[in-house]
Amino acid sequence: MLNVARLLLVASILIPPMSSSATEGPAAKASKGPTTLLSPGDLLYLGAFAGPESVIPPDYDEWAYGGHALTFNPEGDPSGPADGFPGALFIAGNAQQDTVGEINIPPPIVTDDFNELTRAGILQPVIDLTDGLLTATCVACSTCDCDNWDMGGLQYLENIDRVAWTIYDWYNAGAEDLESLGWTDRDMSSASGVWHIGQRPNDLPDPFHNGKTSDYLFTAPATFATQYLGNRRLLSGYHRESGALGGSQGPTLYAMAPWLEGNPPVPGIDLDAIPLFFYRWFIECTDNQFDFCDFDGYRVDDQWGGGVWIDAGDAMAILLFGLKGLGDNCYGDPGVECPTPACEPGRGYHSDPYEPQILFYDPSQVIEIVQGSRDPWDIQPYLVYSPELEVFDPDCGVLSAVAFDREHGLIYVAEQAAGEWGDTAIHVWQVVATLFADGFESGNLDRWSGVVPGGAEKQKAPCN
């Protein structure tokens, strides 16, 4: 097993960050904002642990095929060991059941074998965190099929000691613009909601349609939110396939502060929110005429599942995690209208091949959008990093929900269905101020990386 402490010691040698799997975005430039920009070299990969165990099919238990929503609870697991990973995680269970539970955080390990991972323990069993509000919202929609409704995102709000959550209709063929946000006490009781994120003009295109706002949740740094966002610290976003029916052809981000509109706000209201970025919809973009796309490299089957806004000393960045399509867009049955895919065998949108990606956005450009000097769709990641060596499935592994222990700089990222029976893996990165060498005893300083390698097969290519 690798000695992480020794790797951190090597990190005291300062070398400019570089990675063969990181590419500079077309909009990359020096930050005009209050900070410098983070790079993949500022993220130290610590390994992974496994979610609670699932049973063999067809009797999947509550935890199989979950992990699509995640948030850090700093007050969780108070009697846990002092192992450097305090707190706990609220995490979505089986996606078909729309439930959430709470697990502890065991120390991660670096391995290519999922079965070697330490299992998280269950602190609170899975329940309907919305206490029936998801079902009630769906039933009130005449064109909705409740089988298509999902738990979207989770975010613990320390300032009000509540767990915020989103719900949404992933199919939504009627483009219904329904309420999507609520919150629950930390003990997973007393659900309140549901509220709409932003104003509803009910005309498409709509900057606040729930097809853009109702999935992942995370928070902006408090000082940034106070200075630039009018104290709107809670962030949300959603990228649905193809971006149609109120969606965005690219990832989105919105800011709000529902606690300023009531404790709790009145059910059904339109919350005050502002767009930080989204991308317009063009039919030509779905038809492989990519010059029409606002988001560079957009594909209809891109999947962005979570994010984190990092502030580390004088460095800052907004990171979004997901699975990125690299091939042409196609809709239909594999082997009929579309080529036979490696990842999704069913009828629908395809953009094979795929790779896991982390998008790095510049907060200074978000400031320009909020202040009105830049359009919300006139923004690109300044850097894209593919953690293909860190994930268990570098071709089809879905990096989904993200949680952040801001005090300790620990990022938790779910890789869905990483285990044989749909078990979730939780990858852990730590934000560090310095870089480290490849971690091998040879002391070879020609190779540098933002990951902890697990052996020769984990080694990054040398920088050019």
Sequence positions of predicted segments:
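Positively charged n-region of N-terminal signal peptides that target proteins for export
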Residues: 1-6, 70
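Extracellular glycan-recognition surfaces and repeat-rich motifs
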Residues: 445-464
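Bacterial N-terminal signal peptides
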Residues: 7-17
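Extracellular carbohydrate-recognition regions
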Residues: 434-447
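Intrinsic disorder/low-complexity segments enriched in polar/small residues
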Residues: 25, 30, 442, 458-461
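Serine residues within intrinsically disordered or low-complexity segments
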Residues: 19-21
